[in-house]
């Protein structure tokens, strides 16, 4: 049952009203202070409960209410309830603008920008962060200016990182728009670094160095990236920040991998592993083991690689990370193949297949099936290659895997696999030399080129010439196996659809409903009206009735626009009294944003139409034991030639030597080659 609303000031005598409001103000402030204390202690859920209670009590102090909104938004942000955080930061921004609090408006704009960035609405976030920067510069707030510069760089950085993931490109090989976005991020980070150096803020300098290193890493400037990460590492050690130190070592390892210094990278990853154990972070420990296993693979030390991949597998199983567990099984299979243990490799390949099927990883499933087939053939467990478990390669290239792997098969093996695969993919055979069926020109279909080259008379004469007899349907069934894969439309079908569209276009006009009876009669009298008649009809439709209809739409839409306007009086927790109503009316009009702000807002709002597009299919979820950037899949594309030189042939069966089958290690994970 809802509690009764508190009495308003007009219903109570003067002294009673003042005492009631005094108690309510004290209660609201006490609740807010307790919520702030709990949030500082890290108990955000309890802090949110106290802040919400303070809003329920309400206050007439606009600055107090603005502070409560800001704290509530920040608390919801840390709880990852970003929609609620966005709501309260919007309330804070509206209230700050209404009462003319420029510093409050700047902080609210910055908080909005950070929340929009996490939601992936980068262009809107840039508008808000730029507003924060403008006000900070206007007020001479150097600390706020530095924070705004960092936030803008962070938004551009996040946007560029997401675009680089979508492009699936290696660091340094990015599309121009992604490079431009990352360059913008680097510029703002440089400005932030210069300002925080002037302010003497070492902690902020460390953050700037770390983000500059990450940005240059994505741009492919690996030497510059190592320079910035070394600066980040030094500041982290200065402050005793173990988490930042671990991140710096990990980033240094990634950069040295792309510089080809694998031994140096391994040392940095070992430091990462040591710090992750000190921090008691199992997920990060598994990531370090995964990176070390891949690095020792590049160093051709397969026994150590298998050791670290086994550690990764154990932690992934403890944390129920099926994605990481599957990747560990795949890596272990490759390592055991390189060590000459195909039986153990087959065990992990089957486990990889099982996990890929569970999590819906189509690429992983295809890779595992191919590995299992090749390992079974190598072990000589099957009597012939035709009896092996044939990998389902249909759609392999469409799933993003490299089709070049099939080119490594020997000629004999390729002859075994090509016939069924070609039939599945194309619906016809391409390599049976003894088959002599009728050509495509034998089919009784109208050919567009002949139609336009020979003319209609030749087309009419063609059936009587008897140069080509129609193909019997029974022959088609015998010679061309039926397939469920759709055939691409030919030029004949395109011609047919062009003609169909041309003649159907006029029929559509005949089926339209006329607005007036006179027009209906005219439509019945003439099936295909002339251009003049259509122009006259279009002029008739602009009748007074039509104008009344549009007037009705305009009036209804105007009411909907009014419903969408922001109202200060609807803010939760706000009690409007004679003391603050003047601030809400007078000061609110004086703080209208300038034209530059609205021009910038319109510019970035134009991209909101992208938010309405259908999203692409979800990618494979990232497991907690996998690094944020699975750098080894990138390494394999960069080091493709090196990897081939490092492969070890199986000392296998005669079947393998005769067929020339490649190692299962050549089958790469999704996104790798």
Curated annotation (Swiss-Prot):
PROSITE patterns in UniProt: GOLOCO (PS50877), TPR (PS50005), TPR_REGION (PS50293)
Stretches for region Mediates association with membranes: 1-507
Residue positions of the PTM Phosphoserine? Answer: 410, 442, 467, 469, 490-491, 543, 567, 653
Q: In which tissues is it expressed?
A: Expressed in neural progenitor cells (at protein level).
| Its membrane topology | Peripheral membrane protein
The ranges of the TPR repeats are 28-61, 66-99, 106-139, 146-178, 180-199, 206-239, 246-279, 286-319, 326-359
A molecular function (GO) held by this record is: GTPase regulator activity
Enumerate composition-biased segments (Polar residues).
664-673
Its keywords, alphabetically, are: Cell membrane, Cytoplasm, Developmental protein, Differentiation, Endoplasmic reticulum, Golgi apparatus, Membrane, Methylation, Neurogenesis, Phosphoprotein, Repeat, TPR repeat
Q: Which residues carry this modification: Omega-N-methylarginine?
A: 418
| Any one of the GO BP annotations | nervous system development
User: How is the protein modified post-translationally, according to the record?
Assistant: Phosphorylation regulates interaction with G(i/o) alpha.
- Give the Basic and acidic residues compositional bias ranges: 420-439, 451-467
Q: Where does this protein reside within or beyond the cell?
A: Cytoplasm, Cytosol; Endoplasmic reticulum membrane; Golgi apparatus membrane; Cell membrane
**InterPro entries (UniProt xref):** GoLoco_motif (IPR003109), GPSM (IPR052386), TPR-like_helical_dom_sf (IPR011990), TPR_rpt (IPR019734)
Q: Name one GO cellular component term.
A: plasma membrane
| Pfam families reported in the protein's UniProt record | GoLoco, TPR_10, TPR_12
Amino acid composition bias (Low complexity), ranges on this chain: 516-528
Record's subunit section: Interacts with GNAI1 and GNAI2 preferentially in their GDP-bound state. May also interact with GNAO1. Interacts with INSC/inscuteable and FRMPD1. Interacts with GNAI3. Interacts with STK11/LKB1 and MACF1.
* Domain remarks in the Swiss-Prot or TrEMBL record: The GoLoco domains are essential for the GDI activity toward G(i/o) alpha. The GoLoco domains mediate interaction with G(i/o) alpha.
What exactly does this protein do? Guanine nucleotide dissociation inhibitor (GDI) which functions as a receptor-independent activator of heterotrimeric G-protein signaling. Keeps G(i/o) alpha subunit in its GDP-bound form thus uncoupling heterotrimeric G-proteins signaling from G protein-coupled receptors. Controls spindle orientation and asymmetric cell fate of cerebral cortical progenitors. May also be involved in macroautophagy in intestinal cells. May play a role in drug addiction.
Question: Which family does the similarity line name?
Answer: Belongs to the GPSM family.
Do you know which PANTHER family this protein is assigned to?
A: G-PROTEIN-SIGNALING MODULATOR 1, LD33695P
The name this protein carries in UniProt is: G-protein-signaling modulator 1
Q: Taxonomic lineage of this organism? A: Eukaryota, Metazoa, Chordata, Craniata, Vertebrata
> What's the name of its gene?
Gpsm1
